[in-house]
A protein has these predicted regions:
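Positively charged, low-complexity, intrinsically disordered RNA-binding extensions
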Residues: 136-243
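N-terminal cationic and glycine-rich segments that engage phosphates or anionic surfaces
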Residues: 1-113, 118-122, 127-136, 182, ...
């Protein structure tokens, strides 16, 4: 198995603090997708995938519709996607993805989280190179398949790693990781080849050796991550600490 499998194995049970956080995160992504590609799911594959993701998280239909409507509401400020890079205590690199309608607020908040933890917010590019941007899909099918043959076929579509895992209902799903730019190509293949798209997202995988921390040192980083993730503007947090 590759690094995507190991990374996911460590993180798959690490969820946002509660359901409302999940809905807020997906809702912002839906709004941004509508802004970029329009509200018609037929011509907006990213929106189509996000709606499937929302359904897999049991996000109410009203929440999905509100997120779509927000994108077309001229009275609502646009969300801006921003990335923050820095170092937490013990030399751990931290990359934060946010979606905000008030950049000044978000910058001030994120900087304070780093400072209070004994870390520091860095400049653009200071830790970004330690993480590779990827797309991730979860799909399933009732039909028989051969995972090795599937992997060989999907390599031509930008898939770099494929493996199986069980979801919370103990149903088998196929997980795909691919090149960041291959999102639409992979999604199209899934939709055209009889597989059910369960969820899809963009993510980052560390490309450096992860640092092992224990005891109080590990707790320091976990506290920083928790503080950052509690911010409503924050979408994702990645670090170079071994989970």
């Amino acid at each position: 198995m590759g690094r995507a499998f190991e990374f996911r194995k460590e993180r798959k049970f690490k969820r946002w603090g509660h359901m409302a956080r999940v809905f807020t995160k997906i809702g912002k992504e839906i709004t941004i997708a509508v802004k970029q590609g329009g509200p018609d799911v037929t011509g907006n594959p990213r929106l189509r995938a996000l709606i499937q993701t929302a359904r897999s998280e049991n996000m109410p239909k009203d929440n999905i519709e509100r997120a779509i409507k927000r994108a077309t509401d001229k009275d609502q400020a646009d969300y801006k996607e921003v990335v923050f890079e820095g170092y937490g205590p013990h030399g751990i690199a931290v990359l934060v993805e946010a979606a905000t309608d008030n950049n000044n607020r978000t910058v001030a908040n994120v900087r304070s989280y780093f400072t209070k933890s004994g870390g520091s917010l860095g400049t653009s590019g200071s830790v970004d190179y330690m993480f590779d941007r990827k797309c991730m899909f979860r799909m399933k099918t009732a039909n028989p398949y051969d995972l090795e043959e599937l992997e060989l076929e999907l390599i031509d579509y930008g898939v770099e790693e494929i493996f199986e895992e069980e979801n919370e209902n103990e149903e088998k799903e196929i997980v795909l990781y691919g090149e960041f730019t291959a999102f639409n190509t992979i999604q199209k293949w899934i939709e055209e080849n009889g597989y059910e798209l369960v969820a899809a997202e963009f993510t980052r995988l560390p490309n450096v050796d992860l640092k092992v921390l224990e005891g109080d040192a590990k707790a320091d980083i976990e506290k920083l991550i928790e503080r950052i993730e509690e911010d409503d503007d924050v979408q994702n947090v990645y670090t170079t600490m071994q989970p």
